[in-house]
């Protein structure tokens, strides 16, 4: 192939129509560096084929993978779970699946708003209740969908910016893989500004499987 790397790769993917694209992704010390000019990021923005981003981290030596599945209640999350069901053998016989969903820090957000405009304060208990409701909404369809394909997942509630929280958890818990659904983008800018998947791909140390 001759030409701009990202454009040529996306063009070849469209012509060949593979079931999966595997790409190496260099680790970055600064998220902005990945967002600015990354071939990997441009391919994520330009193709609708599942993409596996592989890091320098060695492949797991055992069959018992720890797999995090990031969900947000959308159809894209269900598509990722559907892909897992169709390709279950790729994860091995002893894989441990965790459903990850991040909710905003409702209490901190309300305290900031209250300080700005003298609004009534909200108790931590009320904030906790709201966050749990958001979490249950995000996982309501994902958990039964996983159970339907023979997976009994553990649900993990995270708090904070979704991309940051998921990547932070994956790194802290040393997950072997994170799987997530993502909608396509019509241009690179929208991917940079709007994609949780892009954020996770930038910050997580483990491989990331992104399903369209």
Give the location of each predicted region:
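Small/aliphatic-rich secondary-structure junction motif
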Residues: 64-122, 144-151
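Short, structured interface segments
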Residues: 40-58
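Short beta-strand elements of ligand-binding domains
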Residues: 24, 51-56, 210-212
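General small-molecule cofactor/ligand-binding pocket signal
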Residues: 1, 52, 98-100, 154-158, ...
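A short acidic, glycine-rich active-site loop
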Residues: 120-134
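Glycine-rich, Arg-bearing micro-motifs that act as flexible, cationic patches
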Residues: 23-42, 62-64, 177-203
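Structural beta-alpha unit
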Residues: 1-21, 144-178
